[in-house]
Design a protein with these regions (language model features):
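Short, well-ordered alpha-helical packing segments
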Residues: 12, 16, 300-303, 307, ...
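Non-catalytic, well-ordered alpha-helical segments in soluble enzyme domains
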Residues: 6-33
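A short local structural element in Rossmann-fold oxidoreductases
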Residues: 13, 27, 135, 307, ...
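A cross-kingdom feature strongest in bacterial/archaeal respiratory oxidoreductases
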Residues: 1, 31-328, 340
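Non-heme iron-sulfur electron-transfer modules
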Residues: 309-369
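A broadly tuned preference for mixed-charge, low-complexity surface segments
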Residues: 7-11, 199-219, 341-361
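Ferredoxin-like iron-sulfur electron-transfer modules
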Residues: 274-298, 327-334, 361-395
Length: 395
């Protein structure tokens, strides 16, 4: 235990006057009531124990008579006893905000959710299928920001009015709502965001029978990424198999990026495109960073670390809606679409006119697949070896 502290369960045993260790207590409990003589170590090794459970039956002739039911049947019987509903609400905690204990931390409030890319809010996530059936919508307003419908969400007679995010890949018949928001006690006014989903919390049962209805009003979201798919831009995230990758030299897969300088395509390695004067690189330490995109889960821990290390300003919900967030790095999220890259490119090239053909083509390409794959693309800070924070970068 950390710093020789007692495990919580062992403290409970001591307070009850029991000197046995918690490990031995668990072994004894399993041995007497579950294992029926089987090996505890074997069950621990297997991660499970397959056996039978005894259930008492009410019988006036023989109160001690027991019947055996396989544990699998017992589990199925428990599931079958659950109430059926058109929709199920899943209560969850966000990667950043968690259960809300740190809701007074503006870094966490402004941290975009890795999947929805939305900050300063919790919301009801629904599938496109259910949103269409309920009349719920998301749409972009004139400045490009994301707005959406409100929904009245009712669980066990309690109703909350919650904004709605239509989430690609969400299972039909399920809706999600994050805990940790809606606090009013002990928080600054700016941090009192979202709705308090703990009103729906029932012990450890985080899946609830729910009723969802369209409500009046229009909610303004602070969403940092409004494009959901690659839209034919295959250079953003390059994917291939190892077999195909080995058919070419690695330099052919990693060409030098080009930028426009005086309307001329120029390599980014050219001194002419550097905003800073060249300096002597022959002395001192040299730092580099490589990210395994196969391992990145988009958790955003690096985003918070960078925000904290460099004391980056928090701009608030209104400015985030105006695309003025000041994170020095971000983790973009892209969904796969129903069309291939080639089909997306063909759509763009064959469309005629911006306000008619191309605009409609881009709108179609922006829709994620019903069951999409998700790719994360870290976009690092652009200080290009000139920032004083580089030597202590926590990322």
């Amino acid at each position: 235990p950390l710093f020789n502290t007692s495990q919580f369960q062992e403290s409970l045993l001591r307070w009850l006057g029991n000197d046995i260790s918690y490990h031995d207590y668990i072994k004894e409990a399993w041995g007497t009531s579950i294992l029926n003589g089987s090996s505890f170590n074997q069950a621990l090794h297997d991660g499970m124990f397959v056996g039978t459970i005894e259930t008492e039956t009410e019988d006036t002739t023989d109160a001690s008579q027991n019947t055996e039911m396989p544990s699998g049947d017992a589990a199925r019987a428990l599931v079958a006893s659950a109430k059926s509903s058109a929709l199920e609400l899943v209560l969850y905690t966000k990667t950043g905000m968690g259960d809300g204990q740190q809701a007074n931390n503006p870094w966490l409030q402004e941290f975009p959710d890795p999947i929805t890319r939305t900050s300063w809010d919790n919301y009801l996530t629904v599938s496109k299928f259910d949103a269409d059936a309920l009349g719920l919508v998301n749409f972009n307003v004139a400045n490009g920001a994301l707005n959406g419908s409100y929904a009245n969400v009712t669980v066990n007679g309690k109703t909350l009015t919650v904004p709605v995010i239509i989430q690609p890949g969400q299972a039909k018949g399920s809706v999600g709502l994050a805990l940790g928001y809606g606090r009013t006690k002990g928080l600054k006014a700016e941090m009192q965001t979202g709705v308090n989903a703990f009103a729906f919390y029932q012990g450890f049962n985080t899946i609830q029978e729910v009723t969802v209805e369209l409500a009046s009003g229009e909610h303004e979201f602070a969403c940092v990424q409004l494009q959901n798919t690659l839209m034919g831009r295959g250079s953003i995230i390059k994917e291939t198999t190892l077999e195909i990758f080995n058919t070419k030299d690695k330099n052919e897969w990693n060409g030098i990026p080009m930028v426009s300088l005086n309307h001329v395509e120029t390599p980014v390695t050219s001194p002419e495109v550097d905003l800073w004067e060249e300096f002597d690189r022959s002395i001192g330490h040299h730092f580099n960073l490589s990210i395994d995109l196969n391992a990145c889960t988009g958790c955003g821990a690096c985003v918070i670390a960078c925000h904290a290390e460099n004391n980056v300003p928090v701009v608030g919900k209104t400015e985030v809606r105006r695309s003025r967030d000041m994170h020095w790095l971000r983790i973009d999220r892209y969904y796969s679409s129903e069309d291939t890259f080639a089909e997306d490119i063909d759509k763009k090239e064959s469309a005629e006119g911006w306000f008619t053909g191309q605009k409609q083509a881009l709108r179609e390409m922006e829709q994620g697949s019903e069951n999409p794959q998700v790719s994360f693309q870290p976009v690092m800070c652009q200080h290009c070896n000139h920032a004083p924070c580089e030597t202590v970068c926590p990322v």
